[in-house]
Amino acid sequence: MTKKSKIDHYSDKEALDFHIAGKSGKIEISSSKPLTTKRDLSLAYSPGVAAPVKEIAKNPDLAYDYTSKGNLVAVISNGSAILGLGNLGSLASKPVMEGKSVLFKRFADIDSIDIEINSNNTDSIIETIKNISGTFGGINLEDIAAPDCFIVEQ
């Protein structure tokens, strides 16, 4: 007999089967532009990227026009307070962060990527977030234990 979740009445086996079916995990990346011809590929990558690169270098706000930044959220955790399960580590938090990412997509059409930081050092977590924050239009902090979560949020 498989163990049932108290919350949704799904067995652990059903949940594991859901996560492993088809492609593993719950998120994937797809192109918002056509990539059917050599020209498309050249515009999407090299040499076509040179034009928006130069424009963004002159005016960083143009990153919102020429890239996905404005519709991209980082869902970040260190896994120190996973959904009532406790501190199970950053990698174990990945299914939760992927789940939050698909909720962003499903209910707000916001693209999101999960980022698990393998550290319990508040300064290290803050530094990592600061260093990657320019890539994203938003940062969602998730399942970071108190009191560190309040320090990181500030």
Which residues does each PLM region occupy?
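N-terminal ligand-binding/catalytic initiation module
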Residues: 2-154
